[in-house]
């Protein structure tokens, strides 16, 4: 019995030792592969000094407060061995790590207590650590200097959160900048940038004003093995064949109702608290059917119809019944609106939309917009849709039954990544916004149903 147990333990130790040796050997090989970079790899360190740019007037006191930061980057310089690298004037790409020191001892934070009454507190704004990826492109690329732009995207983590600006510990971090880069010698660059950066949680958790900063950035870029030799551009450039696709997408997201929607005032001015059953998060879904046109190696656009649905509409109808029971002015008098019952169809929306894409090989930055033509809340009523660009105020019916994120128009900002040998599928993530406010984040899967190329 003792020998059997001893043999069993020895066997386990043998396999554990074998596993450890194999793991160490693979780790050493991986490190050798990682650190054996070529002349396309570079390292960069940047220092930042900026000022806050608050959107809300009540946060104007923050404009004079400074923010300091440090960036570390590792990048890859393209050399034109692929056509898209030449099309984008030999851009570079890589990963960044960022630290931001926020010198704000106290920030104003307004919310509501359990009875629906507004309250004001002051809290400290914590520091921020961010990591993600970036693209560094050139508006002008010369022999000794270039005028560049950077697009950065990733995640940020805040040491303090739960206030009006940063509602959660994990957030999205975005930045865009422009400025000159000077090639000092074969191994060093000096760069200067003017940058706008934004950090928020894409409305996953409210409140979510976010932090906006305009800053100056000065950095040094180090090329350990010099610069790569660039493959010359072909003149004339290779002929491009335009193409068209019919596509369909499925986009899902969750949103949290804005804080001001969680209470309302009755006709006599009394603040009424929310419904007893709290439903803070709502599912949102958009199905798109449209046409994708690739009219240039770097640019394309979509024209489509958005068929949307949100569970937040049900909440609006429940709130309407509470308002009716409390004798709200919308339900009294000659201009009284009807008291309606909720159904699945009343949560539907229809909107035509367009989107413009900048295509970096398989990766695309996207910017688009849409306008609502129809809402399900009108189904079975004699109420008419308002066509102005105002979000509310012209229709008591819309103010009562239509969720605030679905009033008139909306925009999309995000990215796609094309999959497959023929790039017939894609995944993406977008911020659905209106009036410079993020409604919620969408996660998208799409497929091209039909494709054809223009005749030569």
Which residues does each predicted region cover?
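Transmembrane beta-strands of outer-membrane beta-barrel proteins
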Residues: 41-45, 91-95, 147-151, 174, ...
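Residues on the lipid-exposed face of transmembrane beta-strands in outer-membrane beta-barrel proteins
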Residues: 45, 70-76, 131-139, 151-155, ...
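Residues that define the transmembrane beta-barrel architecture of outer-membrane proteins
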Residues: 39-41, 64-70, 89, 125-131, ...
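Short loop/turn motifs that connect adjacent beta-strands in outer-membrane beta-barrel proteins
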Residues: 31-40, 79-91, 140-147, 184-188, ...
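Outer-membrane beta-barrel "beta-signal"
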Residues: 72, 212-233, 438-456
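Transmembrane beta-strands of outer-membrane beta-barrel pores
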Residues: 47-53, 76, 97-103, 153-161, ...
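Surface-exposed strand-loop-strand hairpins of Gram-negative outer-membrane beta-barrel proteins
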Residues: 51-71, 108-121, 256-288
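Outer-membrane beta-barrel translocator domains and adjoining extracellular loop/strand segments
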Residues: 55-60, 106-112, 160-164, 202-209, ...
């Amino acid at each position: 019995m003792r020998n059997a147990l001893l043999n069993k333990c020895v066997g386990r130790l043998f396999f554990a030792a074998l596993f450890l040796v194999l793991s160490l050997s693979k780790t050493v090989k991986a490190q050798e592969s990682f650190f054996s970079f070529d002349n396309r790899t570079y390292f960069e360190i940047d220092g930042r000094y900026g000022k806050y740019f608050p959107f809300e007037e009540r946060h104007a006191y923050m404009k004079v407060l400074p923010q300091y930061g440090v960036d570390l980057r590792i990048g890859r310089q393209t050399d034109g061995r692929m056509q898209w690298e030449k099309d984008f004037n030999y851009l570079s790409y890589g990963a960044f790590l960022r630290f931001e020191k926020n010198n704000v001892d106290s920030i104003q934070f307004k919310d509501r207590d359990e009875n629906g009454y507004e309250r004001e507190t002051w809290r400290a704004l914590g520091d921020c650590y961010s990591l993600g990826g970036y693209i560094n492109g050139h508006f002008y690329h010369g022999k000794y200097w270039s005028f560049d732009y950077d697009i950065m995207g990733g995640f940020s983590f805040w040491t303090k959160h739960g206030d009006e600006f940063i509602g959660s510990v994990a957030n999205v971090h975005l930045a865009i900048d422009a400025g000159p880069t000077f090639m000092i010698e074969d191994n060093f660059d000096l760069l200067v940038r003017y940058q706008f950066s934004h950090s928020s949680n894409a409305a996953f958790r409210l409140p979510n004003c976010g932090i906006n900063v305009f800053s100056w950035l000065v950095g040094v870029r180090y090329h350990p093995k010099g610069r790569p030799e660039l493959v010359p551009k072909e003149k004339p450039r290779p002929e491009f064949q335009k193409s068209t696709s019919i596509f369909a997408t499925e986009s899902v997201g969750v949103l949290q109702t804005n804080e001001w929607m969680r209470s309302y005032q009755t006709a006599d001015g009394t603040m009424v608290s929310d419904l007893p059953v709290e439903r803070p998060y709502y599912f949102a879904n958009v199905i798109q059917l449209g046409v994708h046109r690739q009219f240039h190696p770097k640019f394309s656009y979509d024209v489509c119809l958005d068929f949307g649905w949100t569970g937040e509409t049900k909440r609006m109808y429940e709130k309407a019944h509470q308002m009716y029971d409390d004798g709200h002015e919308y339900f009294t008098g000659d201009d009284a609106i009807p008291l309606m019952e909720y159904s699945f169809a009343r949560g539907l929306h229809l909107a035509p939309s367009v989107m413009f894409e900048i295509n970096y090989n398989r990766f695309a930055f996207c910017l688009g917009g849409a306008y609502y033509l129809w809402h399900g809340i009108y189904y079975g009523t004699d109420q008419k849709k308002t066509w102005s660009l105002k979000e509310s105020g012209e229709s008591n019916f819309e103010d009562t039954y239509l969720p605030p994120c679905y009033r008139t128009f909306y925009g999309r900002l995000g990215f796609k990544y094309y999959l497959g040998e023929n790039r017939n599928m894609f995944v993406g993530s977008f911020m659905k916004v209106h009036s410079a406010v993020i409604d919620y984040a969408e996660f998208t899967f799409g497929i091209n149903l039909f494709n054809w190329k223009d005749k030569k």
